[in-house]
Structures are given as C-alpha cells and as structure tokens.
Amino acid sequence: RKIAVKCAYENCFISINKIIYIESYQRKRIIYTKEQVYETGASLNDLLSLLPVEQFEMPQKSYIVNFDHVTSITKTKVILDYSTEIKLARDRMTNFNMKFQKYIRG
C-alpha cells in the first residue's frame, strides 16, 4: 500500500512499509525511507491520517515513527533502524509504549 503526498511540484507515491519516520522541520515535513528522503508541505496530522493508526505513532509533537522500524525504546528515546534516535516525550511515553506492545503482539 502507498500514500500520495505532494512533493515540490509533483505527487510522490510512497510505500507505507518503507517509511521509517517523518519529521516536522520548520515549515515542511520530511519523510525518511531507506532509499530516499521526501519533502512535503502537508501537516503531520494530515500525514498521520493517511497512515495505518496501529502502525504509526508520534513519540513527540514533531515526529511520526513506523513501529516496523523501531529497534528499541528507552525512557527518553526511540531508536530506529540505522541507529536513528528520536526523543520520547515524557507525557507520551506510557501511551507510546502501550501502543507499541500491542502492535508487536499483533
């Protein structure tokens, strides 16, 4: 399954399972995959609404992560493939951990 997002002057079709994480930086959202990095003006909430709710979550207000690419979770951060570390907000920690546990149990 893919999502369509407006990237620069064209529509990009991105495979959902290839998305590692999405970052909100300044006035754009950056979608990271293994092969490529995409930039879009869509909001994080708009992007989150296109993604499977059980597979994606926000560890803090500026990021969305794909549970398929989480390698570990500490009290303060989420570690993804390629040793990418994203801070885990204290007020989101419990919900994030519960949702991740539910996801890996299937």
Predicted features along the sequence, with ranges:
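Conserved binding/recognition cores within well-folded domains
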Residues: 1-87
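Eukaryotic intrinsically disordered, low-complexity regulatory linkers and tails enriched in Ser/Thr/Pro
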Residues: 1-9, 92-106
